[in-house]
A protein has these predicted regions:
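Surface-exposed, interaction-prone regions used to assemble/regulate multi-protein complexes
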Residues: 1-130
Length: 130
């Protein structure tokens, strides 16, 4: 869903961990990622200041996703960009969904909808062919 897409926009949510990211590939493929839990952009330094993290995220605008990885034990999501920077989205929370992703706007899925469920489970909804 995210491979070879470019990060093209962000809507800021009500708190420091709530953001909606938009991705696009060509003229016909859109995807979104709603983050509702902790996240950060990996870099060489270990500073995790909120303003700095948002700036790092914004700096990734228009970069292509080079690699996508889901964690083994929990659905931690890692999007690695062509620059080598990685956006890490936590996939575990005791009571709440950590993130959702789909391939249609607004916040839906034409073919895919993925949800990092409470307790670290991943729900995958796939359109069935008729």
């Amino acid at each position: 869903m995210f491979n070879t897409t470019s990060f093209v926009g962000i809507d800021f949510g009500s708190g420091p961990n709530h953001h909606l990211l938009y991705f696009k590939r060509g003229n016909d493929h859109e995807a979104w990622l709603s983050i509702e839990g902790p996240w950060h952009v990996h870099t060489a330094d270990a500073v995790f200041d909120e303003a700095l993290q948002l700036q790092r995220l914004i700096d990734l605008r228009r970069e292509r996703v080079h690699q996508v990885r889901l964690g083994d034990g929990h659905p931690h999501l890692e999007l690695t960009f062509e620059s080598g920077h990685t956006l890490f989205v936590n996939g575990f929370h005791e009571q709440y969904e950590s993130w959702q992703a789909g391939d249609a706007r607004p916040l839906g899925g034409d073919q895919y909808l993925l949800v990092a469920m409470p307790q670290g489970e991943l729900a995958v909804f796939v359109e069935e062919e008729a």
